[in-house]
Amino acid sequence: MNAEGRVAGRAVTREEIIAKLRETAPDLRAEGVTGLAIFGSRARGDARQESDLDLLVEVAPRSKFSMLNLIGVEHIVEAATGLRVQATMRRSLDKRMRERIADDIIEVF
């Protein structure tokens, strides 16, 4: 995948994104990530070329995972996929947001 999230001139598919995320799992786990999911337009399959990749990040309950770690996760995923990434801690979602994205979520690991 190139820096625009394209493979050989075509937009990257949801399945290709998930495969890349699973390949990066060891690096993400080294950052403290215990679970990862995608949601939003890339998960639904209706993303445009400029759409970002929305991630839900899970960490161990008492870990010292910081905003810097979350930014590190974004950088790892951006490098692997060529997509702009917006990472959110799953535990930080309020009830309304959880309900809004529930149907979009695809667990990666």
Segments predicted by a language model, with ranges:
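P-loop (Walker A) phosphate-binding loop of NTP-binding proteins
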Residues: 41
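A short, structured beta-strand/loop element
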Residues: 49-51, 55
